[in-house]
Regions:
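Short, Asp-centered acidic motifs that coordinate Mg2+ and/or phosphate
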Residues: 1, 46, 126
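N-terminal Rossmann-like dinucleotide-binding module
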Residues: 1-20
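Conserved hydrophobic residues forming the short capping helix/wall of the S-adenosyl-L-methionine
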Residues: 14-18, 87-90, 116
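Structural detector of well-ordered beta-strand residues that form the stable sheet scaffold
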Residues: 28, 71, 98, 127-128
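Predominantly a Rossmann-like dinucleotide-binding segment in NAD(P)-dependent oxidoreductases
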Residues: 96, 103-166
């Protein structure tokens, strides 16, 4: 099943599936709560969440309460309370909840891991990494400038797991 606030994005995804020879997927779109209809389906095992960050925790919690496993883009949560709410829901519902972290498998991260495993840094007692990149060309892509606003209102590295994941 496919879900997005914007029907045109669902249509694009549907076209990709069709071109690849997959059957047509059920679609949900056009309202703020369309994703809940997807989660309510009995034939869905896993929900993959790739929305603005403010929606991650509520969507993960709802999906797990509906018996779904969850895979969510980073950051999965933006507050400590959200983290505990997600953890407690996963434990209570016995559903898997995974934060997707594709950047930890990039060349630089795996090279650093390999060097550490070879002992090139000696005994590693502590390490810190960060993931910082210029998002200026993408600001218009993020509806309502949610990503720019988040970065303006919060300090620190919102992708703390990117730099040293493995």
């Amino acid at each position: 099943a496919l879900c997005d606030l914007h029907p045109d994005r669902v249509e694009k995804s549907q076209a990709i599936l069709k071109k690849a020879g997959f059957p047509e997927a059920a679609t949900y779109s056009g309202s703020e709560d369309a994703w809940k209809q997807l989660c309510d389906r009995a034939d869905i095992d896993l929900v993959y969440i790739a929305t603005d960050w403010a929606r991650h925790a509520p969507m993960m919690i709802y999906a797990m309460q509906k018996g779904k496993h969850v895979a969510c883009e980073v950051p999965a949560v933006t507050t400590l309370k959200e983290a505990w709410d997600v953890i407690n829901t996963a434990e209570r519902t016995q559903r898997h909840c995974m934060m997707l972290e594709n950047c930890v498998y990039d060349f630089f991260e795996l090279t650093t891991l390999n060097m550490a495993q070879q002992g090139l840094f000696g005994d590693v007692l502590s390490a810190k990494g960060a993931y910082i990149h210029n998002l200026e060309p993408f600001w218009k892509y993020y509806e309502g400038d949610w990503r720019l606003k988040f970065n303006q209102e919060h300090r620190g590295d919102v992708y703390a797991t990117h730099g040293l994941g493995p």
